[in-house]
Amino acid sequence: MGYGDALDFSGLTVLVVGGSSGMGNGIGQAFRECGATVHIWGTRAGAEDYAGVEGSDLSGLGYSQVDVADPSAVAAAMVPFEQLDVVVLSQGTVLYGRGEFQTEGFARVVNVNLTSLMTCAMRVRAMLAPARGSLLIISSTGAFRSTKGNPAYAASKAGTLGLIRTLAEAWATDGIRVNGIAPGLIDTKMTEVSTKHPERLRRMLDEIPLDRLGKPEDVAGAALFLASPLASYIIGQTLVVDGGSLLS
């Protein structure tokens, strides 16, 4: 391996689940910029439905609508490649207003944030194995601490850590490397409920040693590293990308 070429993904295929906006979209575009052919699974009917949506840039990316909360939809989902070199599972949801304290809301969040990860992972396993590919699962720093108003979010993200470790061990014999990323407070549409309030934002920044919000590009950099030959001897790990917030 030449280190200068380690982030060249030319000729490789990448699927980003939940890549229509936010962190997932940033990851998809980063792989495209590094030469990969990238396909996105999202929730809207077509790529054109994301035109003008904040944090969404599907230019140069393939797209399919897939409801990852529905196992039958995942089983039938189109993947336009014979094999996959990298799969990123970045789907996620959260409910505010104490919605996760209701049984229905709790189940909905866990289904998307945890159960669908296993559903999607099983769907792509046979396509990753021939390429000895990389599976990346996006968790959260919420896996390591209480998220007071969001019990389902915290529980599902903590469960993701166990899933990453277990799949990494189970699939290592297939040559599939499984790792995760735990982002902290990233400036996306999903976090606007907090970041649009100056006083609340200031309190949050006071807990981040780097004194800034993360950007989707910060998470994308971690994804490129973990999927590259630079990380060829790393499995079952979850890389924290949080500006140091877990240190305080």
Language model regions located:
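Short C-terminal tail/terminal secondary-structure segment
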Residues: 2-5, 145, 224, 235-248
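Substrate-binding pocket helix/loop in short-chain dehydrogenase/reductase
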Residues: 97-110, 204
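Short, small/polar-rich loop/turn modules that mediate ligand/substrate recognition or access, typified
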Residues: 172, 177, 234-236
